[in-house]
């Protein structure tokens, strides 16, 4: 028996999985099911490409009083991965550089302020769901110079971890492991 309440709750996921990219963005004509990319619209003749979405991530090293180096991570307050640890980051907005996006996401998710000019490229990875992860590295900061952690609209807290551990997404776990292996 179909649970109507469950169907309504899960409707956005069903719609997203079945209807996303199902119609031409130029004229609205439906594509044939399982059309390959790039898609040529039979209605208007326009070609549509499915390009990756750029995501900026940032590694902020932190040195504690004992001389141990760690990284700032956030505990996610939104899905996917609610309650799990992640690196600060998010989608790059139109009109901003990846460095600007990295420090904006750091500020939005932790309240920590950084200068975009200080961000250096650490690595680039292809993520799941069609993303391209551009990971920046900031200069290390002293733990004593950082303000206390406060929840934000997207995170429950920020904290410093001193070694690799599982994060909300495999690509983030790999980036963290790569950082600690190179530090």
Question: Which positions does each model-derived feature cover?
Answer:
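Unchanged
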Residues: 92-182
């Amino acid at each position: 028996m179909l649970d109507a309440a469950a169907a309504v709750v899960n409707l956005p996921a069903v719609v997203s999985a079945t209807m996303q990219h199902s119609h031409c963005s130029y004229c609205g004509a439906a594509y044939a099911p399982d059309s390959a990319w790039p898609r040529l619209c039979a209605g208007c003749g326009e070609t549509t490409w499915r390009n990756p979405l750029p995501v900026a991530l940032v590694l902020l090293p932190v040195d504690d009083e004992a001389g141990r180096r760690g990284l700032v991570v956030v505990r996610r307050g939104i899905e996917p991965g609610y309650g799990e640890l992640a690196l600060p980051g998010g989608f790059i907005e139109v009109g901003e550089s990846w460095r600007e996006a990295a420090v904006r996401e750091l500020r939005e998710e932790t309240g920590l302020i950084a200068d975009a000019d200080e961000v250096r490229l650490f690595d680039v990875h292809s993520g799941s769901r069609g993303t391209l992860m551009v990971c920046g590295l900031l200069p290390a900061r002293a733990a004593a110079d950082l303000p206390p952690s406060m929840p934000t609209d997207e995170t429950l807290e920020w904290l410093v971890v001193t070694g690799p551990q599982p994060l909300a997404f495999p690509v983030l776990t790999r980036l963290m492991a790569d950082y600690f292996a190179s530090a």
